[in-house]
């Protein structure tokens, strides 16, 4: 499967706007997908998104600027839907049992070869995108993500890579 690639740069709100503008219809399709599987009313989803907006803002206000930029670029009337996308795992974990059928990451030493599978819905495969983010002259990020989501599986130009896995815990956590 070949994924489309887009490149964005600038300040967080500018990157978000470019992301939203380039992937507007894909973002709408991603919102529709999650709205169906969240198993909650739109009002409940948006209330949860408000909570996660404050958590995200407390952690890093620039992330909120990027999320708001995505909503503006994609012409999403309610930016809370973009917060819901960026909090999808947390919202899903409230009702959908998650466990052994989630993604797997692996690393081989000493070369530090890193890989991950993406065990999620086949309905999202055609929406996935390779996003290249030029953060600064010295920093570029390449990641596989879902439209409207500011961070997922990828690597930066300094050689730091990130995988995304769901970890099951015996108590809820709020924050990072």
Locations of the language-model features?
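N-terminal mature-domain region immediately after signal-peptide cleavage
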Residues: 1-176
């Amino acid at each position: 499967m070949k994924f489309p690639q887009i490149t964005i740069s600038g300040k967080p709100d500018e990157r978000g706007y470019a992301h939203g503008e380039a992937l507007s219809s894909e973002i709408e399709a991603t919102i529709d997908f999650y709205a169906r599987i969240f198993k909650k009313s739109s009002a409940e989803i948006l209330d949860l998104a408000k909570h996660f907006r404050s958590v995200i803002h407390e952690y890093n206000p620039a992330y909120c600027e990027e999320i708001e930029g995505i909503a503006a670029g994609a012409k999403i009337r309610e930016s809370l839907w973009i917060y819901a996308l960026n909090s999808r795992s947390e919202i899903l974990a409230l009702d959908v049992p998650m466990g052994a059928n989630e993604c797997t990451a692996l690393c081989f030493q000493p070369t530090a070869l890193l890989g991950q599978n993406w065990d999620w819905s086949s309905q999202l495969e055609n929406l996935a995108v390779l996003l290249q983010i030029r953060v600064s002259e010295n920093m570029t990020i390449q990641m596989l993500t879902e439209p409207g989501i500011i961070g997922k599986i990828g690597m930066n130009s300094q050689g730091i890579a990130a995988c995304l896995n769901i970890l099951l815990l015996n108590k809820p956590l709020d924050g990072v």
